[in-house]
Amino acid sequence: MHHFTLFSLRRLSYALMYFRRPPWDTGISPPELMEHIAGHSAGRALDLGCGTGTNALTLARHGWQVTGVDFIPAAIQQARRKAGAAGLPVDFRLDDVTRLDGISGPFDLALDMGCFHSLDRTGRPAYLNNLERLLAPGGTFLLYAFLQAGNEAGKRGLTEAEIMAIANRLDLVNRVNSTERGRIPSAWLTWRKAAA
């Protein structure tokens, strides 16, 4: 019951942010994604926690076949409207990234800009199981996440131990540490699933 209540409050908190423009919804895709697009042939992409679809639409404009997933109805509605207005065939789904039962891979790219680091610790193993199931052999997982120094329950961000745990499943290809808004430690992490 405690998990359900915490999950419900978290969902409500995110849903309320979509009555205005959430601070993370800049409408601009980051250079790290643009660099990936420039260096790889278009394929299938999965945008985990896609919000209003900015990055999914960027991928689609560059020829990618994209599925975007978010658990906030208002975000998915906005994403679908934006895709319709742009004439882009993006499959936006209202779903929970810890479930994803109706989504089939394989995907050549999985993109996550701030979704995984917001999950509570109990949802992270299911997320990673889905990621591993849906990512194609040789596929890339491009992750932007806040970092945290300790292992404080309920605090957003990944610990070094969690990053190492992901490294037991996927190969860490690149890591660039930075700070968000000049004060929050963060990183871009590029992972690759071993080729079959």
Model segments located where?
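Residue-level marker of regulatory loop/turn positions in helix-turn-helix DNA-binding domains and
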Residues: 108
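A conserved beta-strand element that flanks and buttresses the S-adenosyl-L-methionine
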Residues: 111
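Short catalytic micro-motifs in class I SAM-dependent methyltransferases
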Residues: 114-118
